[in-house]
Amino acid sequence: MEALAKEIDVPFALAEGAEGLAKLTAACRKADTIAVIDTAGFDLRNGKARAAFSALAQIESVEAVGVVSATADAEETLETVGALSSLGAQRLVVTGVDLTARLGALVAAATSGTPLANITCSAYVAAGLETVTPLSLARALIGSCGDADAGSAQ
């Protein structure tokens, strides 16, 4: 994250523990700035990890966003999305859309009831996130994810 922040020229801060995170989010609210809180992935079967994610989602002005991989099994993705949603995830990011020929996980996430925020169509962090629109989702499903010219008149 620090390398990405440097690449896109935005400030980076590291919060140690819940108290540090609370202070950082309060400072961001006071300055009317957006903070991106990146956490390590976790096993949804781990009660302590589930409680930590849920607590994070309860912080004032925090929008918890779940991240799932397009390379996962569709049924597993649906279960994961359901669990993340029950813990407070309000939207989803689906990564690795460019890495799989089978897009069942993307379809499962898109039809789960939890809104898709973004997808990734590149292995490079600097390529950023693609906002999900009906057109971008259709392009991803037909295999031209991230191709700005796909479907355009020639």
Q: Which ranges hold each PLM region?
A:
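Structured C-terminal portions of repeat-based eukaryotic scaffold domains
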Residues: 57-60, 79-84
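Switch II (G3) loop of P-loop NTPases
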Residues: 5-52, 57, 69-70
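NTP-binding/hydrolysis catalytic cores, primarily Walker-type P-loop NTPases
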Residues: 110-154
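Short, well-ordered alpha-helical microsegments
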Residues: 21-22, 77, 102-103
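Conserved beta-strand/loop subsegment of P-loop NTPase cores
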Residues: 61-68, 85-126
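Conserved Switch II/interswitch segment of TRAFAC-class P-loop GTPases
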Residues: 42-47, 60-77, 99-100
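Short amphipathic alpha-helical segments
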Residues: 48-50, 78-79, 104-107
